[in-house]
Amino acid sequence: MSVTTLCIFEDEYCENFLPLTYTKATFELICGSKTLLERAVEALKPQKVLLVARDYLREGLEGRTGFVVNEAEVEGDALIVNGRLLIDSQALAILDSLKLGEALTSKGILVAMKLGEGLARGAITNRVFEPRLAKSFASVKEVDLELVEYPWQLIELTSELLGEVSSLGERYEGDEIKVLGSPDMLRTAGDVRVEGPVVVDVRRGPVYIGRDCEIEGYTKIEGPTYIGDSCVIRGAYIRSKCYIGKVCRIGVGSELEKTIISGYTNKQHLGFIGHSYVGEWVNIGAGTNVSDLKNTYGTVKVNIKGSKVDTGLIKLGCFVGDHVKTSIGTQIYSGKKIGPFSHLHGFVYEDVPPFTIWAKSFGAEPVELELESAVETQRRMYERRGVSQTKTDVELIKRLFELTAEERAKSGVKKGRFKLA
């Protein structure tokens, strides 16, 4: 497919993916071994990429992707695509058939438009991403394409798509790993250091281990699983259908199952996380566990914009935003959402707003994490990974702190010093 300018936009459904999308655009979320954005760019192969997202994310998004954000710098014809679209073979075929001046909707939601340079500039500048507005730019037709609507769908889709890692890297040739199944299904990017004994089970799917990873003894990994660059896995049990981003540390006694762990996150100690999506720069304290099954074996419900939504899933864990910290012994109930920059203690049986110190099960009222503490904690964690905190990082924290103040107030989060009696 030949595309001159590709514009990926996020729509108002970004709120469905909170707390993950407080700090990321919707199309930056993981789906398989890549983000939705990476999948779109790889499939459509455009000459130029433009992104449209919430204004407060602009600088960080430009830095992470290298693409122009919220500017209509269109060159030639433009394909404008909803960032929640998973571009598989069906979607690619439909997009390939799209004619200039046409727009596609699915269930009344704009999926894509193909416009000439002038109209595309106007559509992007004015954020014409609703069907009723798109009609002034293009003829609209309905198609049967699924947009990702809720965060738990990313977990399910990732488990289905991880088979794609069989085409990554090269076959592992060392003898330190006991491979159960075809050796061709254990893939690496090279420079993997293994301290045996390690078992990798690829009978249900491939396993990919990124560059410069360390896999220490008594680790077991089941496929399909993706492990990003520069990770350290120390005696952990990584069950099937897991995604682990770059520079993560997963330690002795850790058990992961069907879970997305984003980059720079630490889970060094004993504890279980299953059927969950965990953001970047999260530190998970020893003994932290996530429930992914109700005692009744009923389906898990998740609070979306103030209403309970039945996920239809019997097994579902939690959704953890970026920069969350859990103390030792934290226990998180199924279906809960943890806002970015929050600190958790004890049992977490309610959703936690951003910038909140939570210890209700210890008899303490939730307290607002001070802005200065959030900034300094980020700086310290970055420093431990050899990463420099930037002005953009600090400005995002400040802006997000302001944007989420009302949410904390409605949830009864108080200002003041946190202390346990």
Task: State where each predicted segment sits.
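Residue-level preference for nonpolar/small residues embedded in alpha-helices
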Residues: S33-L36, G205, S334
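Terminal amphipathic alpha-helical/low-complexity segments used for targeting or macromolecular assembly
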Residues: M1-M185, D191, F355-A421
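Short low-complexity stretches enriched in small and charged residues
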Residues: T5-F9, L36, Y237-K246, N283
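Generic, low-specificity signal for short hydrophobic/alpha-helical stretches with a mild N-terminal bias
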Residues: P19-Y22, S136-V140, C213, Y264, ...
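Proline-rich low-complexity regions
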Residues: P19, A25-E28, P197, P224, ...
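Glycine-rich hexapeptide-repeat left-handed beta-helix
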Residues: D11-N16, F27-E28, G235-A236, R249-G416
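Extended beta-solenoid/beta-helix repeat architectures
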Residues: G169-G279, K294-N295, I304, D310, ...
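Conserved beta-strand and immediately adjacent loop positions that scaffold enzyme active sites
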Residues: D77, P197, F341
